């Protein structure tokens, strides 16, 4: 079994760590300018196995670099069969595209986001690629089954949002706005969609709500083979995540990438 080597930094990943880069972007309103241009003429790209994606937001350029070029979520796909996935916090749907492209047309997936624009963009990618067994949901996760709706906080001038506090260490690009979103019981939603199939890969990026989300689905985690998760340091350290996943039999393998604000960690169920 081979182990992927360390991620290679890209120009984009280096720049995002430099405060002067972010100051210049804000001063020149480069994200807003890029988003205006991309809204008129989105970038369209094709992945190695033929899946297609588009870029309609300036912020998505960094996300595309992380997922498609640096491949921060590649570990669950190395030296193991993968047929099913869950994308929690799908945003514009790039991990959904990455996973389905690696799996092939038979991919079975569930992609969830609480931001209505992001859920719609994820659904566009699903429909555009003809993934008949991948389902998109506009819902928020991490609440008890008896809670039908929950608040969700949007930053209207970019594509971020959270069921908890947005990162206070990064200046917001606009006034935060609260919306009400339907909740979803993920274990039931997965069974309705995929039956008794296990989850080969679960990707989690829920902007600081990681522990709350994981604690609401112990049964589903016990049927999950690998987890790749972004933890957000302004809410929680990684150790509580390790503990919740450990109770489900998922062991911490490594930190894939990390910066002062967040990190990506990989977990797996021991094989054999």
Question: What are these model-predicted stretches?
Answer:
Residues 1-272:
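Phosphate/nucleotide-binding beta-alpha loop and adjacent structural elements of enzyme active sites
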């Amino acid at each position: 079994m081979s182990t992927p080597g360390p991620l290679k930094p890209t120009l984009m990943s280096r720049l995002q760590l430099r405060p002067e880069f972010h100051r210049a972007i804000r001063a020149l309103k480069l994200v807003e300018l890029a988003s205006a241009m991309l809204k008129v003429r989105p970038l369209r790209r094709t992945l190695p196995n033929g899946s297609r994606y588009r870029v309609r937001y300036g912020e998505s350029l960094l996300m595309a670099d992380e997922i498609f070029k640096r491949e921060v979520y590649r570990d669950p796909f190395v030296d193991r069969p993968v047929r099913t996935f869950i994308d929690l916090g799908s945003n514009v749907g790039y991990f959904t595209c990455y996973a389905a492209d690696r799996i092939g047309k038979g991919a079975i997936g569930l992609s969830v986001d609480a931001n209505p624009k992001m859920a719609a963009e994820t659904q566009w990618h699903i429909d555009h690629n003809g993934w008949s067994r991948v389902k998109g949901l506009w819902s928020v996760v991490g609440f008890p089954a008896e809670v039908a709706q929950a608040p969700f906080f949007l930053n209207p001038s970019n594509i971020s949002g959270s069921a908890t506090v947005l990162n206070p260490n990064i200046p917001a690009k606009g006034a935060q706005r609260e919306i009400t979103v339907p909740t979803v019981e993920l274990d039931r939603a997965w069974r309705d969609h995929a039956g008794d199939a296990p989850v080969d890969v679960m990707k989690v990026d829920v902007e600081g709500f990681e522990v709350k989300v994981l604690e609401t689905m112990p049964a589903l985690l016990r049927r999950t083979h690998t987890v790749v998760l972004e933890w957000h340091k302004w809410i929680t350290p990684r150790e509580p995540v390790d503990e919740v996943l450990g109770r489900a039999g998922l062991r911490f393998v490594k930190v894939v990438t990390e910066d002062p604000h967040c990190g990506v960690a990989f977990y797996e169920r021991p094989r054999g």
